[in-house]
A protein has these predicted regions:
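Metal-ion/cofactor- or nucleotide/acyl-coenzyme-handling active-site neighborhoods
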Residues: 1-180
């Protein structure tokens, strides 16, 4: 059976969610308020948890990762309260410290991915998640498909630098580009 998850969280007004990573900005974030917030939390990778498995500062409602399951603590996979989204090729991955495979875990969905340009990032004609080799981009695509339209990011520290060709194109179109 296929689950009907498209726009599951959509509302009349733009629906918000927290997108929680484990980058340095989480250290200065009001994690207690975020954790207590009724807004859905989408966890990415360690989602506020250290690689040593220390307790998460924010327990996600939804979780995803591009990386192998062996990198993450078993409590994420075995918790039925956390809805997990994993690439289809991870179904048979072993869960650390157990004899379970990812396909044995509760509340776990597997998806197929595809490579497509960022111009087609939100292509509703595609039934696959964008394969950008990046968990954050994957989480954005999953969140958008679930119906979220406003993302509050914490611990999501990354910088995307445009290529020289992209900067040249922007400048030729009259766009003032500032690298700071």
């Amino acid at each position: 059976a296929t689950a009907a998850l498209e726009n599951l969280y959509a509302g009349n007004d733009p629906t918000a969610c927290w997108l929680v990573g484990s980058g340095p900005s989480i250290l200065g974030a009001p994690v207690e308020q975020i954790a207590a917030s009724p807004v859905v939390k989408i966890g990415v990778n360690f989602s506020g948890r250290g690689p040593d498995g220390t307790a998460p500062r924010i327990t996600p409602d939804i979780w995803t990762s591009f990386d192998p399951t062996s990198r993450f603590h078993r409590s994420i996979f075995l918790n039925p309260r956390i809805t997990k989204f994993l690439k289809a090729d991870k179904q048979k991955d072993l869960i650390p410290g157990t004899t379970f495979k990812a396909c044995d875990c509760p509340a776990t969905y597997f998806f197929r991915s595809e490579t497509r340009g960022y111009g087609d990032f939100l292509d509703s004609r595609s039934d696959r998640i964008l394969n950008a080799l990046d968990s954050f981009i994957q989480a954005l695509d999953i969140g958008y498909r679930l119906g979220f339209r406003r993302f509050f990011c914490v611990g999501a520290d990354f910088i995307i630098r445009p290529s020289d060709a992209q900067v040249s194109l922007a400048v030729s179109c009259g766009i003032d580009f500032d690298e700071t």
